[in-house]
Amino acid sequence: MNDQLTAIYTELLLMKEELQSRLFEYSCFQVSTSPQAAINQKQKATLIYHIKEELQDVLLALSKIENGTFGYCEETGAPIPLAKLAVLPTARTANDFLYSVQFEKKTLPIWKSTDIEYGQALYE
């Protein structure tokens, strides 16, 4: 394993540890019957879902490194440059990097403090 791949592997191990910690933290919430608690539980359930998805991606990347198939596009079989994988180590296809370009072009709405929906937008 070369230095760049070792660095990616180490980063994935750290990601795994952090995601498992977050999953445990969000899984240990108290059950309450208040309406606000119900909203919080839905938000936590959504967070847990996304954390589990990311954790699965990390575990898959780690297993690919261990069995020697890391760095190859799942669609075409073409190698993916390690420089790109260092940025997005859970990428499974070469097309995964195209999405980051699309996300960078998007902007968030600019809210003025005088907008009526400003406060609501911050908490939705």
Curated annotation (Swiss-Prot):
Domain of life (superkingdom): Bacteria
Swiss-Prot/TrEMBL keywords: Metal-binding, Zinc, Zinc-finger
SS bond partners: none
Keyword Metal-binding: yes
Pfam families reported for this sequence: zf-dskA_traR
Any GO MF annotation of the entry: zinc ion binding
Zinc finger residue extent: dksA C4-type: 73-94
PROSITE patterns, alphabetized: ZF_DKSA_1, ZF_DKSA_2
Coiled coil (UniProt feature): none
Protein name in the entry: Uncharacterized protein YlyA
